[in-house]
Amino acid sequence: MNLSNHFLIAMPDMEDAFFSQSVVYICKHDEDGALGIAINKPSPITMDMIFSATGKNIPMRMQHDSVMMGGPVQVERGYVVHTPIGNWQSSIGVSDNIALTSSRDVIENISREGAVDKALISIGYSSWSKGQLERELADNAWLTVPADEHILFDIPYEHRYAAAFAKLGIDPLALFSGAGHA
C-alpha cells in the first residue's frame, strides 16, 4: 500500500491535539515510513513574513492565503507543495504534477509569473516511522482518499476537512471510529 498523493483524514474522535480534524497530504510513503503536510491547520506565520524574508512581493493570487502548520516536525523550516513540479533543489515528486520542495529557491520564484502555478506553503511537516502509519490505519485513526488538487490548493483551509470527507461521500458526524472493537 502506497499512500503517496493521498489525503489522510483524521477520524472525528481523534484526540491528538495537533491532528484532531486534520487533513494531511501524504507526499512520500514507502517501506521506511511516511511524510506529509497538514493542509488545514493555519500557522501564526504570515505570507508577508515569508515573502519579506526573500525580498520578493507576495503574488496577488496568494495574498489572502494562510501559511499552514504542516506538522510538528521541523517547525523552523518551510515546505511548499506546488504545481508544476519544476526543477528545484530539495524536491520530492509526489505525482506527475505535484511536488514538495523544502528549498528557498521555490519561494523566491513563486512571484515569477509561470514559475509556480499553485502553491501551499507550510512550516513543519508530519512524519510516521516504519509501520507506524499502517498501525494507525488499522486502529481506525485515519481514513484515506486519493488527493484532489482542488481541495489541496483552491478550497479555503477551514473547509478542507469537510471537503475531504465529502469526497468519500461520508458525513463526519455520522462516524464512530470504535466500530468493530470490543
Swiss-Prot record:
Transmembrane segments: none annotated. It comes from the Bacteria. One of its GO terms (cellular component) is cytosol. InterPro entries: AlgH-like. HAMAP family: UPF0301. NCBIfam families: PRK00228.1-1. Belongs to the UPF0301 (AlgH) family. PANTHER family: UNCHARACTERIZED PROTEIN YQGE (PTHR30327), UPF0301 PROTEIN YQGE (PTHR30327:SF1). This is UPF0301 protein NMB1336. It comes from Neisseria meningitidis serogroup B (strain ATCC BAA-335 / MC58).
